[in-house]
């Protein structure tokens, strides 16, 4: 009897991200900045990254951190814990949480505009940072540019990739090298606004771009109805 009570107490003490997610719901991320708010979803195909991002979000880890590296027509990067109290001109990008996440590369998840992906250092396993991430802005590509990218990488793009990169845009040279684990479903204009900010020689915005990140489990039908996202 005591063991059952102890087990029940442990289960009740677990945070929301540690329990089995409800089948008919998804975790809706709200990322607010001084340039507006984005809503994002995390992919089930990358469970380790999804669980980790939910964990950090529930812990309020990202609140007050900066988008410390922004490059127009490429991406915006944030999640460095050292950025919370960084002074103007401080070099950022090396802060972490002391662990990496094994790569979860999926050919169906590529670097289209709005993709949420894990930053990483140069390691042969392509393991991801435990906390730093980037959101793709990229650019629109033509056939010639995509052929060049395929030749350089030695990989072929799917019809879906080619069509998406020619219309929505993205950063195809990152495919297969970094784990894409989510997507912006609302607020792409915010990505554009942040990406075009004046920056220093290290690509840090001259004016701080801070984030607040929260999330909640929402019925998938409601997400589809509110944001037009199809599962």
What are these regions (language model features)?
Residues 16-231:
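Cyclophilin-like peptidyl-prolyl cis-trans isomerases
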Residues 5-13:
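Sec-dependent N-terminal signal peptides
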């Amino acid at each position: 009897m005591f063991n059952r009570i102890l087990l029940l107490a442990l289960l009740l003490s677990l945070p929301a991200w540690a329990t089995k997610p409800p089948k008919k719901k998804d975790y809706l991320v709200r990322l607010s900045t001084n340039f507006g708010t984005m809503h994002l979803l995390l992919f089930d195909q990358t469970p380790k990254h999804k669980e980790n991002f939910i964990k950090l979000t529930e812990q309020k880890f990202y609140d007050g951190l900066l988008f410390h590296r922004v490059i127009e027509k490429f991406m915006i990067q944030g999640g460095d814990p050292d950025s919370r109290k960084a002074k103007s001109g401080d070099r950022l990008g090396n802060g972490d949480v002391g662990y990496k996440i094994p790569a979860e590369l999926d050919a169906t998840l590529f670097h289209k505009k709005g993709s949420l992906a894990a930053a990483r250092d140069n390691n042969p396993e392509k393991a991801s940072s435990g906390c730093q991430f980037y959101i793709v802005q990229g650019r629109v590509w033509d056939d010639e540019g995509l052929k060049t990218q395929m030749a350089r990488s030695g990989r072929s793009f799917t019809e879906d990739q080619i069509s998406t990169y020619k219309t929505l845009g993205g950063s195809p040279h990152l495919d297969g090298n970094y784990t894409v684990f989510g997507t912006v479903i609302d607020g792409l204009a915010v990505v554009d606004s942040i990406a075009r900010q004046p920056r220093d020689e290290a690509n840090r915005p001259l004016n701080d771009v801070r984030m607040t990140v929260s999330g909640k489990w929402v019925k998938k039908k409601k997400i589809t109805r509110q944001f037009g996202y199809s599962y």
